[in-house]
Amino acid sequence: MSSPAPDALLGPADIRELAAALGVRPTKQRGQNFVIDANTVRRIVRTAGVRPDDVVVEVGPGLGSLTLALLEAADRVIAVEIDDVLAGALPATIAARMPERAERFALVHSDAMHVRELPGPPPTALVANLPYNVAVPVLLHMLDTFPSIERTLVMVQAEVADRLAADPGSRVYGVPSVKANWHAEVKRAGSIGRNVFWPAPNVDSGLVSLVRRTEPIKTTASKTEVFAVVDAAFAQRRKTLRAALAGWAGSAAAAEAALVAAGVSPQARGESLTVEEFARIAENRGADHADDANN
C-alpha cells in the first residue's frame, strides 16, 4: 500500500476553498462544524487505534477532513452522508487528493438513522465527528445495527461526552450513559478545542472511546425491555424508583415488587444503578403477580 502525499489532508484554506466552490455553509440545523486542522484528524485516527485491516464507517464526513486521515490508516472507509451537496462532492475530493486509496472508499448517501446495511465487508470500527444535534441517537443506532463494530471513537459536544462516559452516581449519569454501556465499555479519550473547527462552535468537544463488550449483558430481558426501564427511571430522575417506575410496572406496588425481586432498593434513584441492575429490574417485571400465583 503506497503512502499518500504529505499534503493530502485538508487544511483551513483547503476547507474554505472547497466550501466556496460548492456553495456550502455549515448549518446549525444539521449541527455541522468542519474540522480544519490536519493534526487533529490524525490525532483522532491515532486515538481510535485504527489498524491497516480495519473497515471503518464514518458518519457525517462533511468535506472529507477526517475521511482522508482514515484512508491513510484503514483498509477501507465507508462514509455515510445525508447532505446532497457534500455527498456529491466527497468522492471527487478523495480521488483528487488520495487517488491511490480511492478504490478503498465507499459512500452511502443517506440519513445514518435509516442505514441498515453497508457495502462491502462488515465494519470493524466507527470513527466520526458526529453532528451535535443527533450524536447520541446515531451512535446508539450504529452500535445496535452493526454488531461487527468492535471499537468506536466519536467526537461530540463536551457535555455529551461527559454524559456518555459517566459512571453511576455522577450528576450527569443518565439515559445515554446506560444505553451506551449496554453495548460497550465507555470512557473519555480526550478534549478538542474550538479553534480547530469552522465555524468555531460555542462549546468545546470531547472524544469518547467505546469498546464493544466481548460478552453481552447476562439477562433474560431483551434490549427493548431493559431500555424501557431506563427511560422510565430517568424520565423522573429525582423521584425514587418506586415512584418513577409505577407507570412502567402498572402501579407503585408492582414497581416495588420488581425492584425488591431484582435486589434494588425501591428508594434508590435511577442515577445510582448500573446497566446490569436495570436489566435485573426488567427481568422481574410482574414479580408481584408471580408472588400471588405462588401463594
Curated annotation (Swiss-Prot):
Where is it chiefly localized?
Answer: cytoplasm
- What does UniProt give as GO cellular component? cytosol
> What keywords sit in the KW lines?
Cytoplasm, Methyltransferase, RNA-binding, rRNA processing, S-adenosyl-L-methionine, Transferase
Its recorded reaction(s) are: adenosine(1518)/adenosine(1519) in 16S rRNA + 4 S-adenosyl-L-methionine = N(6)-dimethyladenosine(1518)/N(6)-dimethyladenosine(1519) in 16S rRNA + 4 S-adenosyl-L-homocysteine + 4 H(+)
Q: Tell me the compartments it is located in.
A: Cytoplasm
A Pfam family of this chain: RrnaAD
Family matches, as SMART domains:
rADc
Could you tell me the EC number(s) of this protein?
Answer: 2.1.1.182
Does Flavoprotein show up as a keyword for this record? no
Q: Which residues bind S-adenosyl-L-methionine?
A: 33, 35, 60, 81, 111, 129
Report the sequence similarity comment from the record. Answer: Belongs to the class I-like SAM-binding methyltransferase superfamily. rRNA adenine N(6)-methyltransferase family. RsmA subfamily.
Show the PANTHER family listed in the entry: DIMETHYLADENOSINE TRANSFERASE (PTHR11727), DIMETHYLADENOSINE TRANSFERASE-RELATED (PTHR11727:SF7)
What the protein does comes down to:
Specifically dimethylates two adjacent adenosines (A1518 and A1519) in the loop of a conserved hairpin near the 3'-end of 16S rRNA in the 30S particle. May play a critical role in biogenesis of 30S subunits.
- Protein name (record): Ribosomal RNA small subunit methyltransferase A
What high-level taxonomic lineage is stated for the organism? Answer: Bacteria, Bacillati, Actinomycetota, Actinomycetes, Kitasatosporales
